[in-house]
Swiss-Prot record:
Temperature remarks: Optimum temperature is 30-45 degrees Celsius.
Family membership: Belongs to the phospholipase A2 family. Group II subfamily.
GO biological process entries: lipid catabolic process
UniProt cofactor(s): Ca(2+)
Spans traversing the lipid bilayer: none
EC numbers for this chain: 3.1.1.4
pH dependence of function: Optimum pH is 8.0.
Protein name as annotated: Phospholipase A2 crotoxin basic chain
Provenance organism: Crotalus durissus cumanensis
Expression sites by tissue: Expressed by the venom gland.
Length: 21
């Protein structure tokens, strides 16, 4: 789903130190 996709992006971005909000 779109929610899971956004959550995945935020988790990956968080590991890279990039804020996705």
């Amino acid at each position: 789903s779109l929610v899971q996709f956004e959550k995945m992006i935020k988790e990956v971005a968080g590991k890279n130190g990039v804020p996705w909000y």
